[in-house]
Amino acid sequence: MVNVMNTLSFASLSFNSNNTPVSEQFDDIYFSTQDGLEESYYVFQDGNQLWQKWQTHDVESFVIAETGFGTGLNFLAVADKFQQFLSEFPNSKLKRLYFISFEKFPLTSEQLATIHKNYPQFATLSQKMTACWQPRQTGCQRYHFEQIYLDVWFGDMLDNLPQLGDLYTNRIDAWFLDGFSPDKNPEMWNETLYRQMFSLTKNGGSFATFTAASTVRKGLQAVGFEVKKRKGFGKKREMLWGEKPQQSETAPVNYPYFYSESQTEANDIAVVGGGVASLFVVLSLLEKGKKVTLYCKDNALAQNASGNLQGAIYPQLSDDDERNIRFYVHCFDYALQRLSQIEPLVEFEHALTGVALYAYNDKTAKKLEKIARQTNDDSLFKLCSAAELSEKIGLKVPNGGAFMPQSGWLSPIQFVQGTFAYLQTKGLQIVLNHEVKDPQFSEGKWHWQHNGKTFSHQILVLANGHTLTQFQQAQGIPLYPVRGQVSQIPTTPALQQLKCVVCYDGYLTPVSKANTHCIGASHVRDKAETYFSLEEHHENVAKLQQNLTACDWTQGIDESQNLAKQGVRAALRDRVPMVGQMPNFSVQKVQYQNLYNQLRRKQAVENAANFANLYMVNGLASRGLTTAPLLGEMLASLICDEPLPISEDIWHVLSPNRTWIRKLLKGSKVE
């Protein structure tokens, strides 16, 4: 069994006589004993001439990459400086800073907070960062601080750098070549790093580093950088800095069949939806400065699957594909961060008091044991005995299972409607009772007719669940509807003691403010009707009583009120969503009919044929509360041509054309 999440090791930290943090792994200091902050300003900010570059930058985002996050001091210093820049130059074209950093041995949030106490000028940003800092697995974790985005790639940098992939080529404006010194950490300072750096750097992009080692200078020159020397910081005689020549050739696309286009010049975006998937696309697009209009076919928002009174939020950890597990854990951590940001702004019922996974039969028990072998993070998932699980649940259960302490529930309908209302105060336009039909692209815009009027937008995003297949552009997307009915029951004296969500072959939520619980949910594939089903209502309650058969607290349930919410989920057979540019299926199946042989013969392959300015996010199924925040951020980043917070291997798993590309890569025919 592959343990997909235990490859991350934390730093062994000590402090020297100057109270400077020291890595015991590398036997090296994290920053100068003279003045770590001044060293950061001098070496990296001045070395890359950031203040001057920001004033003349001609796009809305600036991307810095750093080779060792360490204490986060470089990030805090440059973030603080960027906030000063925005204050001093409010009309600048540049609006957002992306700071991409790599860290093999992360410090804990407690260690970071201790070190940051020496820099009270950064206290606010440090507190925000350490509050959500939880290195859990290898790969990218995005953190938001208004106009500043921090992406930390945990794990070995030489493994992570290639995972930045095609969408990062020619993307990085400046490098902070930090990390421990070349003689202490020779594994990092090598040709592989320099070659990847050169590919990822924009023409004219720069780097700066504290070292002047000849091996580093020659290595950077060998891959194409122009390398120069300047006075080193403090007692150091010299340091290196340099640039990528303006006339450098762009690196070829490695995966042209998964290629997507961005639209940096387009500002006017229409989003079709009304549920949680569209909500987070809209949120991220607004944060990136776009003008957004939401079109919803219903007379109110959150009328479909996002309209439940209570819904669980937790990651899907059961999967044979470790990329899927990594995706869901990334999503979960990002969702928790987003919820903490929205919580002060919007009123919605929620309680992150945990989710109990009940082992109602031997098969489920073995499945939970398998998951436990894939993670050593008890804050995410922990096996429990019957006594332990009973204590977590608040009611006695005869079997054990597992507990996910950071998970919980929220009210989707309150959350979605409340957050959309908040976003209207930030410029979002919402149009209800408007079904977008038969959109056509011409002269750089998408157009459609509604009630005798023409509506036009530069970009169209389809985040409309199972109705996606009504658009002819979605031909070939193997989406199918799943009808679900969630039952609502009045509480009982026993059920009022329920502390957390309980999952079995269904789920039961704790009591809401309305003194009700939700029991869910039926699963009827290929059905899109939303009528009340008495049979499904009875089945929901029966599942609870049958799965927790020895629990007398399940027996006194009153189901006579026949209260339930029906919704239709959009699902995909491989159980992960789709996000990206809309692929043109009819063209791609011809374009790539000989893909297997082209790759085998190392022949050139065209970039994928997609519909211009048309994007989608779909297939969230029953995991929308967990996955929608990161999916929305990914899609907005793609549209805006800004760094994606996900590794390339997972991005390919989420690609809208993945089902037929997989077949074509094997030499199979696609009809």
Swiss-Prot record:
Which Gene Ontology terms describe the biological processes this protein takes part in?
methylation; tRNA wobble uridine modification
* Protein localization: Cytoplasm
Positions of the UniProt region annotated as FAD-dependent cmnm(5)s(2)U34 oxidoreductase = 272-671
Which keywords belong to this entry? Cytoplasm, FAD, Flavoprotein, Methyltransferase, Multifunctional enzyme, Oxidoreductase, S-adenosyl-L-methionine, Transferase, tRNA processing
Q: Name one Pfam family in it.
A: Methyltransf_30
What Gene3D superfamilies does this protein map onto? D-Amino Acid Oxidase, subunit A, domain 2, FAD/NAD(P)-binding domain, Vaccinia Virus protein VP39
The Swiss-Prot or TrEMBL record annotates one GO molecular function as:
flavin adenine dinucleotide binding
The answer, when asked if Membrane is one of the entry's keywords, is: no
Its principal location? cytoplasm
Documented EC number(s): 2.1.1.61, 1.5.-.-
Catalysed reactions, semicolon-separated: 5-aminomethyl-2-thiouridine(34) in tRNA + S-adenosyl-L-methionine = 5-methylaminomethyl-2-thiouridine(34) in tRNA + S-adenosyl-L-homocysteine + H(+)
A GO CC term attached to the entry: cytoplasm
According to its UniProt record, which cofactors does this protein need?
Answer: FAD
Q: Where is this region: tRNA (mnm(5)s(2)U34)-methyltransferase?
A: 1-245
Q: Which domain of life is it from?
A: Bacteria
Q: What does this protein do?
A: Catalyzes the last two steps in the biosynthesis of 5-methylaminomethyl-2-thiouridine (mnm(5)s(2)U) at the wobble position (U34) in tRNA. Catalyzes the FAD-dependent demodification of cmnm(5)s(2)U34 to nm(5)s(2)U34, followed by the transfer of a methyl group from S-adenosyl-L-methionine to nm(5)s(2)U34, to form mnm(5)s(2)U34.
Recorded family membership = In the N-terminal section; belongs to the methyltransferase superfamily. tRNA (mnm(5)s(2)U34)-methyltransferase family. In the C-terminal section; belongs to the DAO family.
Protein name, UniProt field: tRNA 5-methylaminomethyl-2-thiouridine biosynthesis bifunctional protein MnmC
Organism annotation: Actinobacillus pleuropneumoniae serotype 3 (strain JL03)
Q: Which gene encodes it?
A: mnmC
